[in-house]
A protein has these predicted regions:
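Bacterial N-terminal signal peptides that target proteins for export
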Residues: 2-16
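Bacterial N-terminal signal peptides
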Residues: 13-26
Length: 524
């Protein structure tokens, strides 16, 4: 199917619908449910692993192991690798069995390590149990590119009817959707066992949901450099005379919209997974994403407010989560963004990046940003200017303030920095230096590893500085870092023990053990 923009509905096969419902309801009386989804014919597979699940004491059920591309950078070039992914839904308790099919199994780890999942190993097979939803990486013999990503999601509770006139429904199977403009008041449902080749444009509308358990991808039949059909609303001036950005190939574009939910699907993008601009009241929950090419970001937020990103798994070949001011046709401040309960894996660039883009003639403020309960599995970025698992790099006269990082666990990254806070002037992206960074609080930030480079904290000049920066209960390889820590000579800077360089124009930096008198940054 060539480039088309249209609305339509796919009917779910009645037999598959019945099978899914039967699997789900069979355990409802006992509070135990297990839903597995047959893969559509023609879906890409990977035979590195054999994966099975069961309710305790019942027969094993096979999971299809999909092939997904992840990015290994070799000599500064993107080199996609064939990784594995499987998914299912459950409630109660489930047993998982994974067999490695590519030789002897010498060692295995299941990440995030904070979950402390200790499998039973017998030969080339491992077993473990889950009692709550988890997004996992199962790595045999230290292999991080040919690993298994296993997504154990909660059972769906709000699956819409295929006959609902306000639903665009993709049942199990392969679908070539093209570019779909989603009307306001519409639910797009991608069922488990579905693979949808296309992109969804949510532009100048309200009350839209894109939900399900299936896979959204773009096959490459349409060249990435070509311009897709332009959403009508996106090319019309807004009341402020601005236009959007619908001439891209992001799988999910949310712009100038309100009350949008993205929930449960898996995305294999060709550019950004989600591009969000000038939108508000947006919730992204239980989204999973893999990418392996240049500029294949995860979720990028421009000039938006009241956004919740929760329980996502992002493994991308560029920034996992990026929060910006002005770029392209998006203008205005960014505020009240929360990222929580998530797993981030940056094969290139940053797990978290704040700042960079803005509007120097009309400076933007990025404020009230929260990052809570996050596992960072990796950063691998050879360019020093783009290192930092947690980065606030303000340019273009941006002011970033009132930012909180809490309960962030960083595992042993391959190449990068723990934090990078700079008021900067990056001539590749900026036309002016940043405005400043104020009131940033890191609480319970931990790093376990030996490969992180020196972190950097630096202002630009006396009027473009970093002010009021607190690290509370910072731990490096289990050691608590604070201003009065035992064994620190008085003439040493505390930052020396945190492997941080603190440059000029940084005021109010402190490392504390706990803070009973104040638990978050003071707001202006």
């Amino acid at each position: 199917m060539h480039q088309k923009t249209f609305y339509y509905r796919h009917l779910l096969s009645p037999l598959i619908t019945l099978a899914l419902v039967t699997i789900t309801l069979a355990g409802s009386l006992s509070g135990q449910s297990l839903v597995v989804y047959p893969a559509p014919q023609g879906s890409p597979g990977n035979d590195d692993f054999t994966v099975k699940v069961r309710r305790p004491g019942e027969p094993w059920q096979d999971l299809y192991s999909y092939g997904v591309k992840v990015d290994q950078v070799i000599e500064a070039r993107h080199t996609p690798q064939n990784s594995s992914m499987a998914y299912f839904d459950f409630s109660g308790t489930v047993d998982v069995e994974v067999t490695w099919n590519k030789g002897d199994l010498h060692a295995v780890r299941i990440r995030p390590l904070s979950y402390d999942i200790q499998p039973v190993i017998k030969g080339n097979t491992i077993r473990f149990s889950l009692s709550q939803p988890r997004n996992l990486s199962i790595e045999v013999n230290g292999e991080i590119f040919h690993n298994l990503q296993l997504f154990a999601s909660p059972v769906e509770t709000d699956r819409p009817s295929a006959n609902d006139p306000h639903t665009i429904y993709y049942g199990p199977g392969m679908h070539e959707a093209g570019t779909v403009i989603v009307p306001g008041g519409t639910t797009v449902y991608i069922a488990g066992g579905a693979m949808v080749d296309g992109q969804f444009l949510i532009s100048h509308v309200e009350n839209v949901r894109i939900i399900g358990r299936g896979i959204l991808y773009q096959s490459g039949k349409r060249p990435a450099t070509a311009q897709p059909p332009t959403a009508q609303a996106a090319t019309s001036p807004t009341p402020g005379g601005k236009t959007g950005n619908s001439n891209r190939h992001d799988d999910l574009l949310v712009e100038f919209s309100k009350n949008v939910e993205i929930n449960g699907i898996i995305v294999l993008p060709v550019t950004y997974t989600v591009l969000m601009g000038n939108s508000q009241q947006v919730t992204i929950r239980n989204l999973k994403s893999f990418s392996a090419g240049g500029n294949n970001d995860g979720i990028d937020v421009f000039c938006s407010r009241d956004v919740l990103i929760d329980n996502v798994f992002m493994r991308n070949s560029d920034d996992n989560i990026a929060i910006y001011g002005h770029r392209w046709g998006y203008y205005g401040n960014t505020a009240n963004i929360t990222v929580s309960n998530s797993t981030l894996w940056a094969d290139v660039a940053h797990p978290v990046l704040i700042g960079t883009h803005g509007d120097p003639p009309h400076p933007d403020t990025l404020e009230d940003l929260k990052f809570i309960n996050i596992d960072i599995l990796d950063q691998s970025e050879a360019q020093i200017n783009y290192q930092g698992c947690l980065s606030i790099n303000v340019g273009d006269a941006n002011l970033a303030r009132n930012i909180r990082f809490e309960n962030i666990r960083v595992e042993d990254i391959r190449l990068g920095q723990l934090v990078n806070l700079r008021v900067m002037y990056n001539r590749k992206y900026n036309t002016a230096p940043g405005g400043g960074i104020e009131n940033v609080w890191f609480k319970n930030l931990s790093y376990e590893g030996s490969h992180a480079n020196l972190s950097v904290i630096a202002g630009y000049d006396s009027s473009r500085s970093i002010r009021n920066l607190t690290f509370e209960a910072l731990t490096i390889n289990g050691r608590l870092i604070w201003d009065k820590m035992p064994g620190k000579p008085g003439w040493y800077e505390t930052a020396d023990f945190a492997h941080m360089f603190v440059g000029e124009h940084v005021e109010g930096l402190r490392f504390i053990r706990s803070s009973p008198e104040q638990s978050e940054p003071e707001k202006k």
